[in-house]
A protein has these predicted regions:
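Rossmann-fold scaffold of SDR-type NAD(P)-dependent oxidoreductases
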Residues: 6-14, 37, 60, 100
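Conserved mid-core segment of classical short-chain dehydrogenase/reductases
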Residues: 14-31, 50, 72
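Alpha-helical segment proximal to the catalytic Tyr-Lys
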Residues: 50, 92-93
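Catalytic loop of short-chain dehydrogenase/reductase
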Residues: 57-92, 103-107, 113-116
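Conserved internal alpha-helix within the Rossmann fold of NAD(P)-dependent oxidoreductases
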Residues: 40-45, 67, 149
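Catalytic Tyr-X3-Lys loop
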Residues: 23-42, 83
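A short, exposed helix-loop element centered on a Lys and neighboring polar residues
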Residues: 45-46, 88
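C-terminal helical subdomain
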Residues: 101-102, 120-170
């Protein structure tokens, strides 16, 4: 049976890549990150909207890294900034759907395990902030974060479609 509409579509594709300077990243590494973090989400949206399906709300899981431009976050920051723009562009094309790029804050995931196990490097200062947050309320488990996100989703409808929100600022 064909689905005619969706109440909520959550786009949660994300790979980090290696923490290193942008000039040390190959185009291929950046392309792979963009493929997962941006283009897979475009494919999902196009598939969901195909056949004239209606969608009430789309939430693209973004990151504070999409705005910060912190050294070392290279393709991840670039791809999450591109995801923010993808969400904004779709919001202009699909005015009956509410779109939000939504940063979940720090979440204790395999990505955090990788970053918090990196050796100290003064070039990548934000890593030390993550290390300090690991194992505290500032970095909840995926399950705890999911509960907070689900509770926050309805309030995002009050914001302008196509915008960016960070759970830490709600």
């Amino acid at each position: 049976e064909e689905v005619e509409s969706f109440d909520l579509v959550i786009l949660n594709a994300g790979v980090l890549g290696k923490i290193k300077d942008m000039q040390d990243c190959s185009i291929e590494e950046l392309r792979e990150t963009m493929e997962v973090n941006v283009w897979s989400n475009k494919w999902i949206l196009d598939t969901c909207f195909s056949g004239g399906r209606n969608i009430k709300q789309v939430i693209g899981i973004s990151s504070g890294a999409s705005l910060s431009g912190s050294r070392g976050w290279n393709g991840y920051s670039l791809s999450k900034a591109a995801l923010n723009m993808l969400i904004k562009l779709y919001s202009g094309e699909c005015p009956s759907t509410h779109f939000t790029s939504f940063a979940p804050g720090l979440v204790d995931t395999a990505m955090q395990d990788y970053m918090t196990n990196l050796p100290e490097d003064p070039r990548y200062a934000p890593i030390e902030i993550l290390k300090a947050a690991k194992g505290t309320e500032a970095m909840p488990s995926g399950y705890e974060c999911a509960k907070k996100l689900i509770d926050a989703f309805p309030s995002l409808l009050e914001n302008e479609s196509g915008g960016y929100a960070d759970i830490r600022k709600l």
